[in-house]
Amino acid sequence: IEIAIATLATDRALLLLGVPGTAKSWVSEHLAAAISGDSMLVVQGTAGTAEETIRYGWNYAQLLAKGPSMGAVVPSPVMRAMQTGKLVRIEELTRIPAEVQDSFISLLSEKVLPIPELNEYVQASKGFNIIATANDRDRGVNELSSALKRRFNIVVLPLPDSVEEEVQIVETRVASLGRS
């Protein structure tokens, strides 16, 4: 966890990697809440995740009524995080098609989201960053490109070493729920 926090403090994106059941989503949610005060800026990766889900969409009624403008842009969670200087969570990054994954490369390198239709762009506010999760041994995953991997610090979350350790983790988690 210390490495994850240090990564985000140095303005580098974080990739939490591990097999299913290693609490990647739980860790990303709690890091985002602790650092940004908001863990709800989330893109859920699936095989059907489109580039618009990451970048922005259009309010077609507004587009038809007033033409192309920033008022017709429907910001994605990524765009909202950039505008507000918060962390955005990308769940299941490796389930997103490879060609869509590549849209993160310029976001992470330049911290800029172009809107070419308007000849505009969104510059990330201070504090913006990405926490992504990925399964490394699951079916239906797309390999990350080396260019994208280079833009993340990768933290591998291991499985518990024993049944006893797993029971202890569950007991601790259940006890903490009672205090919330």
Tell me what each language-model feature is.
Residues 1-179:
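AAA+ P-loop NTPase catalytic core and its hallmark functional loops
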